[in-house]
Amino acid sequence: MKVLLVLTDAYSDCEKAITYAVNFSEKLGAELDILAVLEDVYNLERANVTFGLPFPPEIKEESKKRIERRLREVWEKLTGSTEIPGVEYRIGPLSEEVKKFVEGKGYELVVWACYPSAYLCKVIDGLNLASLIVK
């Protein structure tokens, strides 16, 4: 079984979703990949460009570090290990970045660590993959 955990920069309460992903990995022997989509960074960068404002590059790094810290904290609590499977960071619209990432990789399940919304439902519909939204 191949599982993808999707984290976003807009939703910090990801412990339950990470717990599900860890359980799939440990109890079912699932291969686990983690994708962190920095959609808020993308939107902020677009707004700055639109208004001709400079975009501080440290915002991208700070967002990555914030997700990484939270993931490491929860991962260590659940597994006792600080070794996390590779996390891929993407900056862009959630729908586009997830779709590009899953293409041709054979995922059977996507675990979403984000708040359910009409937008997320559209993203999920476009993937045609089993999905579990954990809020």
Swiss-Prot record:
InterPro entries: Rossmann-like_a/b/a_fold, UspA
Transmembrane regions: none
Pfam families: Usp
Gene3D superfamilies the UniProt entry points to: HUPs
Protein family membership: Belongs to the universal stress protein A family.
Protein name: Universal stress protein Aq_178
